[in-house]
Design a protein with these regions (language model features):
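N-terminal secretory signal peptides that target proteins for export/translocation
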Residues: 1-9
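Feature marking well-ordered beta-strand scaffolds used for ligand recognition
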Residues: 28-459
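Bacterial N-terminal signal peptides
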Residues: 12-24
């Protein structure tokens, strides 16, 4: 039996927002709602937004586009609070963020046709469920005796005491006419923050991060949900820190804080890597889905702030890139250079029981304490020896990792600052996600929407 932890965090006040009209809604059964752990997850960004709002208003000039070796092909304006981006078979999928009952547009996952990259077109949306966010989304082709086609899953988190929580599942084989298939109710913490959809043999799974579930209901933050039959999803495994004798802890983000923020599964579908914030990246053997087993973890140097937000594997799963998301440079532990905005770490994980850090990459702004934007890394994506890094106000950075001990930036794009239609965020670039689709690089900006880029060919 897991230990129940009932420590509560003080709440933050959020600027009231206008409601957005919904494109597609599906009624979802509500479960018993836990305390507002969402405030624990988003308070650092909320506080950074307040500081950036003040600093940006004091700036003399608006921000302009800044590009190196990347060409802007097209863009699509989307209402504010855009979240992650995914791409599949010529379509982009953009999720929706939210931070509380008065800051929850719930516009769902927007579906965008990229047939003409210079003129991307919104063709619909799914999972626009009231009182919830739909931040992380993945689409993949699956083939089982229950379903054959393109499957979309998105993590659902509650914005209020009536919001749903779990995984919403859709058939997007025809993206212009999506069909709802099923819903898995996590009934704990506030839902699924990030996820990874994968097929292994004749079974299909979603690896899901449910932050603070171990605090709220005593079940593991990591869940493994089988969606082989997407109309009847079922949890088959779970894991939490108490499985290795570690008590989960989070003291108002001021000290060592442990929760599963994200999860990535390796190529063969037998290893899950959990982004466990200050506890580092945790490797779990999921060969037996019902019994995830701890293998090892990355360990931060003494004095490091931590904040493992998300990860990406490279080099045949022998390298791990970890994104340390830090919104409070110099405020929590030590002044720079020890405590900066968040940056990239590169690890040798040939032996996942004992990862070794071998390289780092930062932008000039992320090494500063400037407060007129958000200069932390967010999400990494890897293709071959190239890493594509979404970096909030520093846009997207394209980094050569062929020499992982000395990563080198080869391209970048910082979009212009755009007004947040709700007045919540400052008018600065806030690039949430990046994904590569054929020869296109897609970015999602929280205020602006979708950007479509191409990398310039060397002359």
């Amino acid at each position: 039996m897991r230990t129940y932890i009932r420590s509560m965090m003080r709440l933050f006040t959020i600027v009231p927002l206008l409601a957005l009209s919904l494109i597609a809604t599906v009624p979802i059964a509500r479960g018993d709602q836990p305390p507002p752990y969402r405030s624990m997850l988003y308070r650092p960004m909320i506080e950074a937004a307040r500081q950036a709002q003040t600093a940006a208003l004091a700036a003399a000039n608006p921000r302009a586009t800044n590009s190196r070796s990347l060409t802007l092909v097209g863009s699509l304006a989307l209402p504010g609070f855009n979240a992650d981006v995914w791409a599949h078979k010529g379509f982009a999928y953009v999720g929706t963020w939210g931070a509380g009952p008065d800051a929850c547009p719930a516009t769902g996952v927007r579906i965008i046709d990229l047939d003409e990259p210079n003129d991307p077109t919104l063709v619909g949306a799914v999972a626009a469920i009231p009182d919830s966010t739909q931040e992380d989304v993945e689409v993949t082709r699956v083939n089982t005796r229950f379903f054959h086609g393109d499957l979309l899953v998105t993590g659902i988190q509650s914005c209020s005491d009536v919001g749903p929580q779990g995984i919403d599942i859709w058939d997007v084989t025809d993206p212009r006419h999506p069909q709802h298939l099923g819903f898995w109710d996590s009934i704990g913490a506030f839902g699924v923050h990030e996820l990874d959809l994968f097929q292994r043999g004749n079974r299909v799974f979603v690896a899901a991060a449910t932050p603070f579930a171990e605090f709220a209901i005593g079940e593991g933050d990591f869940r493994l949900v089988e969606v082989t039959d997407p109309r009847n999803p079922v949890q088959v495994g779970e894991w939490g820190l108490s499985d290795i004798g570690v008590e989960p802890n989070c003291d108002d983000f001021a000290q060592f804080c442990t929760f599963d923020h994200s999860v990535t599964v390796n190529e063969n579908g037998k290893m899950a890597i959990l982004s466990y914030w200050d506890f580092g990246a945790v490797f779990l053997d999921i060969s037996d889905p019902a019994h995830p087993t701890f293998v090892g973890r990355t360990v931060y140097p003494t004095g490091a702030d931590g904040d493992t937000h998300s990860v990406a594997l490279a080099r045949g799963d022998n390298l791990l890139l970890t994104a340390d998301e830090d919104f409070s440079p110099g405020e929590i532990l030590n002044p720079p250079p020890d405590d900066t905005w968040g940056f990239l770490r590169i690890w040798n994980v040939k032996n996942p029981a004992a990862p070794v850090e071998i390289g780092r990459f930062s932008t000039a702004n992320s090494l500063s304490t400037r407060s007129d934007g958000f200069y932390s890394i967010h999400n990494p994506v890897v293709r071959g020896n190239t890493a594509y890094l979404s970096w909030y106000t520093d846009g997207v950075r394209v980094v050569d990792i062929s020499r992982p001990r000395a990563p080198r930036e080869i391209a970048s794009f910082v979009p212009p600052g755009v007004e947040d239609p709700f007045g919540f965020f400052p008018p600065v670039p806030i690039v949430w996600g990046v994904v590569v689709e054929r020869d296109l690089i897609l970015l999602s900006d929280m205020n602006a929407g979708l950007y479509v880029l191409k990398q310039k060919q060397a002359e």
